[in-house]
A protein has these predicted regions:
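Extracellular carbohydrate-recognition regions
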Residues: 2-37
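Short tryptophan-centered beta-strand motifs in secreted/extracellular beta-sheet-rich domains
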Residues: 24, 82-84, 147-163
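Extracellular glycan-recognition surfaces and repeat-rich motifs
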Residues: 27-55
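Secretory/extracellular carbohydrate-interaction modules
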Residues: 55-124
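Beta-strand-rich interaction surfaces with strong enrichment in secreted/lumenal proteins
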Residues: 66-74, 138-144, 173-174
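Short, aromatic/His-centered strand-loop micro-motif at the edge of beta-sheets
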Residues: 129-151
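Short strand-turn-strand beta-turns centered on an Asx-Gly dipeptide
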Residues: 164-169
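Flexible glycan-contacting loops in extracellular carbohydrate-active proteins
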Residues: 173-203
Length: 208
């Protein structure tokens, strides 16, 4: 007999913890789940195969496109995982944050993010953690922040945070870890006359 999905995901005798899976499919974003925030930005479902959600800015230097759980912080700072599959249309002229955070605007509050900003932090993905006393940046070193699809996995424990790209590169931070509960978030902004885009087609978050 095939086990239920519950039995496959959890050891026998245990009680499941919070988990959600988002495939970013259909004709519009599920606004019963996601809160949208835009400053000259948009979020629409991509009209392309496996395109997921297309987040876009304009050429305005203050353009922002951002989604989160409307400040419903359901995930633990000492035991949680976020997995996201996404690609950037451009890695210059702005920045992107994808991760778990306590704030309600892009990169705000405490949290842990997979971060891209080619002009400031180099042409690689960065792991950025923020705690009560400040932030810590760790470069992945060998994973270029290009315009291909990548799988990003962030994990938080009581003693460390880690970022894994495509299952084979992991960087770890043990300083400035978040000390409060967190919500999933995705955001891009623009700092020059470049129309930035980000496609995201899968996200999963769960408490461990």
């Amino acid at each position: 007999m095939t086990d239920s999905i519950y039995d496959q995901l959890n050891a026998y005798g245990t009680v499941a913890k919070q988990r959600f899976v988002e495939n970013f499919s259909g004709w519009q974003l599920d606004t019963d789940r996601w809160d949208q925030s835009n400053t000259n930005g948009t979020q629409v479902m991509a009209d392309s195969i496996d395109g997921g959600l297309l987040m876009s800015t304009t050429s305005s230097g203050s353009s922002i496109s951002y989604i989160d759980f409307a400040d419903k912080k359901q995930f633990s700072n000492t035991g949680s995982v976020m997995i996201a599959v996404m690609k950037h249309g451009s890695t210059t002229g702005g920045e992107s944050y994808t991760g778990l955070q306590s704030g309600t605007t892009q990169g705000n509050g405490q949290g842990a993010w997979s971060y891209v900003n080619d002009s400031w932090k180099g042409a690689v993905f960065n792991f950025y953690t923020v705690g009560a006393s400040g932030g810590t940046w760790v470069q992945t070193g060998c994973v270029t922040s290009d315009t291909n699809w990548h799988t990003h996995k962030i994990e938080l424990t009581s003693s460390a945070g880690s970022l894994q790209i495509d299952g084979n590169t992991t960087v770890t931070s043990t300083t400035n870890l978040p000390a409060v509960s967190l919500q999933p978030s995705v955001g891009i902004n623009n700092t020059s006359a470049v129309n930035r885009t980000l496609n995201i087609r899968y996200m999963e978050c769960y408490n461990t």
